[in-house]
From Swiss-Prot:
Organism: Zygosaccharomyces rouxii (strain ATCC 2623 / CBS 732 / NBRC 1130 / NCYC 568 / NRRL Y-229)
Membrane topology, as annotated: Multi-pass membrane protein
Matching InterPro entries: AIM11
The protein's name: Altered inheritance of mitochondria protein 11
Family membership noted in the UniProt record: Belongs to the AIM11 family.
Record carries keyword Membrane: yes
GO cellular component: membrane; mitochondrion
UniProt KW Transmembrane helix keyword: yes
Cellular localisation: Membrane
Length: 145
């Protein structure tokens, strides 16, 4: 019988490359979360600054004058920051859960989810995968003889 050896790195799903990949996905999500939290804090501070609190003997129904252009620009920047932070959190969190790191992986998993199963034999294999497949085929062919 042919004695074929597989390394732990070739078989394990928890190899060094896998851990680095998952750490990169985690860091992307945490950076998006930090962006969202910072933009929420800035928006909250901006709202506190606009609050009109009259002093004693000042009218409480007459707010002080303000710039409409400045308010519109500030609202646009704060709204964009909140929307961008929330969207990136959703995208990177979903990719972290689904173990997606690249656009080709995303398109492959989306096609598989939609029911269009692509033939995996047409996909290119890396050298380690082809090595393992060849070794398994050798083992199976030797057992049949």
């Amino acid at each position: 019988m042919n004695n074929v050896q597989f390394s732990e790195r070739q078989i394990s799903a928890f190899s060094h490359e896998y851990k680095i990949r998952r750490k990169r996905q985690m860091l992307r999500f945490f950076c998006a979360t930090a962006l969202t939290l910072v933009s929420c804090r800035v928006a909250y501070r901006g709202m506190l600054g606009r609050k009109y609190i009259p002093n004693m003997f000042q009218l409480n129904y007459k707010p002080p004058p303000f710039s409409y252009k400045g308010e519109a620009a500030s609202a646009l920047v704060l709204g964009t920051g909140l929307a961008t932070g929330g969207l990136t959190m959703m995208v990177f969190g979903g990719c972290w859960i689904a173990d997606i790191s690249t656009f080709p992986e995303f398109s492959y998993k989306l096609k598989r989810l939609m029911g269009q199963e692509s033939d995996s034999s047409q996909l290119p294999m890396d050298t380690e995968t082809s090595q393992i497949v060849n070794q398994l085929e050798q083992l199976l062919n030797n057992d049949k003889k």
